[in-house]
Amino acid sequence: MLTSMSTRRLLLAAGLALFGWTFAPAAQASADPTAFIQEVSSKAITEMAPAASETDKQRAAKLKPLLEQYFDMPSIARYMLGSYWRKATPEEQAEFTAVVTDFLALAYGKRFASYTGHDMNIGRVRDEGDGRTTVFSTVQLPNGEPARVDWTIQAAGDTYKIADVKVEGLSLADTHRQEFASVINNNGGSVSALIEILKKKVGN
């Protein structure tokens, strides 16, 4: 199942953090990883400002370039496919990477048709080694409850790429990895079956 309650909450909180927050400065705001998260969110706010006439597909089309620019989508796609990545053909790997980007763009984008913004506080930054850093933050959900959002970012030259987002300990990458594995298992181990299901989800 590709739209479980936990997944919807995860996408909502992560999406609010990326695309709908008003920045509240923290003590480590000058740190490079923090500045990167600020840059991503500032760009997203500009690009994803709600427009009443926009369709879900139009919002997804605006969001997709941001995912491709700021997220390490090739690595994320490979992780989400798990052990099936090695079993997939190069053509299937490329096709899955493309369609899962479309899927995430649609899943995030459709939640912000009328969203006006909530506060997010960026807190401490932790060096994980091997070029990886975790940026800890808290975002306010529409119901007023706070949610912890942790960003795992990977050094990429003179900038960073987002490798994963965790909401209250739930990993975006892990959640989809489990869902996709279930779909593949239910279709006789076929990666192409998952690809076709995702294509239908995004209308391709």
Q: Residue locations for each model-derived region?
A:
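Early exported N-terminus immediately downstream of N-terminal targeting peptides
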Residues: 31-108
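Solvent-exposed loop/turn segments at secondary-structure junctions
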Residues: 85, 102-103, 127-128, 141, ...
